[in-house]
């Protein structure tokens, strides 16, 4: 089950990256929908050992199986990890590139636009190719592989 499903008032965010899917995120998402929840598929927080990881109102739960959903919704889950932003793995990080990880839908152009994703392209088109190349060269920006 990829994509968002509107069901109920409780909004559950679950990653839809390849690792989460391999760990059973679709089945967990379907269990939340069956329980009357709205599921939003988002990018991963990067805490892969907790996948499938669900987030409800900033609180994390994982790794989950479909049978864990009722305990999560009842507030009795032993798989509660507390506030995701306060988790030691996340709290010690300064996330620049991944600042919106776990909050946006990775394939959503609407989410991309909402967070200013087209601003760089608009600026590059405004100043033209030569000025864009000059700015990149001057900045020293390099590819992830060092190119």
Predicted features by range, described:
Residues 1-147:
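Feature of Fe-S/electron-transfer and energy-metabolism proteins
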């Amino acid at each position: 089950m990829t994509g968002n499903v509107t069901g109920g008032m409780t909004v559950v965010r679950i990653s839809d990256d390849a690792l989460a899917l391999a760990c059973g995120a679709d089945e967990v998402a379907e269990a939340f929908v069956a329980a009357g929840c709205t599921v939003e598929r988002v990018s991963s927080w990067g805490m892969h050992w907790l996948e499938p990881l669900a987030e409800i109102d900033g609180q994390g739960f994982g790794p989950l199986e479909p049978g864990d959903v009722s305990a999560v919704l009842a507030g009795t889950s032993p798989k509660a990890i507390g506030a995701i932003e306060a988790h030691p793995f996340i709290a010690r990080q300064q996330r620049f590139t991944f600042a919106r990880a776990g909050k946006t839908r990775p394939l959503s152009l609407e989410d991309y636009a909402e967070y200013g994703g087209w601003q760089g392209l608009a600026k590059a088109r405004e100043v033209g190719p030569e000025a864009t190349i000059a700015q990149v060269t001057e900045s020293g920006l390099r590819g992830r592989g060092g190119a």
